[in-house]
Curated annotation (Swiss-Prot):
Protein's recorded name: ATP synthase epsilon chain
Record's bilayer topology term: Peripheral membrane protein
InterPro entries registered for this protein in UniProt: ATP_synth_F1_dsu/esu, ATP_synth_F1_dsu/esu_N, ATPsynth_dsu/esu_N
GO molecular function, one term: proton-transporting ATP synthase activity, rotational mechanism
Organism (species): Rhodobacter capsulatus
Amino acid sequence: MADTMQFDLVSPERRLASVAASEVRLPGVEGDLTAMPGHAPVILSLRPGILTVVSAAGTAEYAVTGGFAEVSGEKVTVLAERGLTRAELTAAVHAEMLAEAKKVADAAHPSVADAAAKMLADMEALGSHINL
């Protein structure tokens, strides 16, 4: 079994990362998941949160607002709705993201109100996880 797996993180705007990783921690809608080389194949929906990648260069953190991840034993591919490096996630950017999530939650149809409220709570937690 290999010691690393290919990790790619892309958003509609750009490619944020492409590295050989030994571990990728993903904020899943159904719960967080750590993928390592040899992991069983899975596709998961992402919630707003911190995605952590461990590679030979060290540990890198990325903020994602949602999206999808495809995991296999050889690679992890993340398609993020919006992705930022940890350095790019400033208090001002987080406040903008929170305002947008609140606007969506306030305007949500009753059939999706719970999901919108959960997204808002996850967005608030994102800031507290990184001390914003």
